[in-house]
């Protein structure tokens, strides 16, 4: 959730035309997000086998967990990049990227379904979409940021962030809150898989998807 930090601190700095501070905040956010993403994937690697055995109850899917988990690496700067596009008013670029991601995923999965390619191809389609979004977001950030922050903005020293403790505290609290919400709200399918079967988890996931469509305003 580093996007909130970028919007609050870098966006505020840009509003005051303090480009060096905005650049330093974005650099701080990108470094922090990159490090935590690498740590997250390392934790995933360590827990993948346990998840396959006790939640999915099929050790053979460990490789699928590891491969699909590469989306963490592909999106390691996505939060920061998305926030930079927002504070620099490049919403149209975001919309086009999202559309391209969704179309690519839908076409890939559609082909996999028609050719009966199996679970691996379907996961590859989802992974491709996530990679397009993550890498595309960073590419757009690097393309548009110089106009708002100046050329060579990434070389800005972090020493200018005298309130780095405040930034770190904000990042920690927002990410902790997001993690708690995710564990409570988004882990239902995992608990179903743990206590029941993977088929039950699949049915529950499908039911949630249908319910979300029905409840859409």
Residue ranges and their predicted role:
Residues 62, 66, 96-148, 152, ...:
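Hydrophobic alpha-helical transmembrane segments
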Residues 1-15, 30-37, 72-80, 175-187, ...:
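Small-residue-rich midsections of specific transmembrane alpha-helices
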Residues 25, 60-62, 119-124, 162-174, ...:
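Interfacial/gating helices of multi-pass transporter permease domains
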Residues 42, 46, 57-81, 95-99:
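Alpha-helical transmembrane segments of multi-pass membrane proteins
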Residues 47, 51, 184-196:
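Hydrophobic/aromatic end-of-helix segments at the C-terminal termini of transmembrane alpha-helices
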Residues 58, 87-88, 115-116, 183, ...:
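Helix-loop interface residues and adjacent transmembrane-helix termini in multi-pass membrane transporters
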Residues 27-56, 67, 111:
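Alpha-helical transmembrane segments of multi-pass membrane transport and lipid-handling proteins
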Residues 119, 123, 137-185:
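Interhelical loop/hinge segments that connect adjacent transmembrane helices in multipass membrane
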């Amino acid at each position: 959730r580093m996007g909130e930090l970028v919007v609050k601190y870098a966006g505020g700095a840009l509003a005051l035309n303090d480009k060096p501070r905005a650049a330093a905040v974005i650099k701080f956010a990108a470094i922090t997000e990159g490090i935590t993403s690498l740590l997250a994937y390392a934790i995933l690697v360590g827990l993948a086998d346990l998840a396959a055995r006790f939640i999915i109850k099929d050790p053979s899917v460990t490789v699928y967990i590891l491969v699909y988990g590469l989306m963490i690496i592909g999106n390691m700067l996505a939060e920061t990049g998305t926030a930079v596009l927002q504070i620099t008013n490049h919403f149209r670029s975001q919309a086009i990227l999202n559309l391209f991601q969704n179309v690519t995923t839908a076409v890939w999965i559609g082909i996999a379904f028609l050719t009966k390619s199996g679970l691996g191809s379907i996961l590859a389609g989802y992974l491709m979409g996530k990679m397009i979004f993550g890498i595309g977001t960073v590419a757009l950030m690097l393309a548009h940021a110089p106009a708002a922050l100046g050329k060579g903005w990434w070389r800005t020293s972090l020493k200018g962030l005298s309130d780095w403790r405040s930034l770190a505290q904000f990042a920690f609290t927002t990410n902790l809150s997001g993690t708690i919400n995710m564990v409570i709200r988004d882990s239902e399918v995992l608990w179903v898989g743990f206590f029941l079967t993977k088929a039950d988890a699949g049915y529950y996931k499908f039911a949630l998807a249908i319910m979300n469509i029905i409840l859409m305003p």
